[in-house]
Amino acid sequence: MAAMTFHLDVVSAEKKLFSGLVETIQVTGSEGELGIFHGHTPLLTAITPGMVRIVKQHGHEEIIYVSGGIVEVQPGSATVLADTAIRGEDLDAAKAEEAKRKAEENIQNQHGDINFAQAASDLAKAIAQLRVIELTKRSR
């Protein structure tokens, strides 16, 4: 029996990263991890820095980093509108490690000119990128 599929678009302000039929997606929503399958109840929710794990037709997997945005689920389709979206294999581990180090330093050494909320957001994004890099390496 063939797996049930639905259409998925993953787009950012810069470009469309993915468009096609998928069996399932996993995305980090504002309330936690979401698993979306064919026939999912319609939904519109914010997504936080993290990954979109896509299981394409025939079980092939792709992982995309998103810095935030929204996911909309409709009967037969889903759309991820991301602030920034980068394929896992296109992420730079050295840059992500450096961004993580800088954010941690800014949080620890708070000065009047450092915005704690911005530093925490930068840290969350860097950690999410490193997680996507690790998962991409494992899925190869």
UniProtKB/Swiss-Prot annotation:
Belongs to the ATPase epsilon chain family. SUPFAM superfamilies: Epsilon subunit of F1F0-ATP synthase C-terminal domain (SSF46604), Epsilon subunit of F1F0-ATP synthase N-terminal domain (SSF51344). This is ATP synthase epsilon chain. It comes from Aliivibrio fischeri (strain ATCC 700601 / ES114). It comes from the Bacteria. Its main location: membrane. Produces ATP from ADP in the presence of a proton gradient across the membrane. One of its GO terms (molecular function) is proton-transporting ATP synthase activity, rotational mechanism. F-type ATPases have 2 components, CF(1) - the catalytic core - and CF(0) - the membrane proton channel. CF(1) has five subunits: alpha(3), beta(3), gamma(1), delta(1), epsilon(1). CF(0) has three main subunits: a, b and c. Transmembrane segments: none annotated. Keywords: ATP synthesis, Cell inner membrane, Cell membrane, CF(1), Hydrogen ion transport, Ion transport, Membrane, Transport. It is found in: Cell inner membrane. GO terms for cellular component: plasma membrane; proton-transporting ATP synthase complex. It is a peripheral membrane protein. HAMAP family: ATP_synth_epsil_bac.
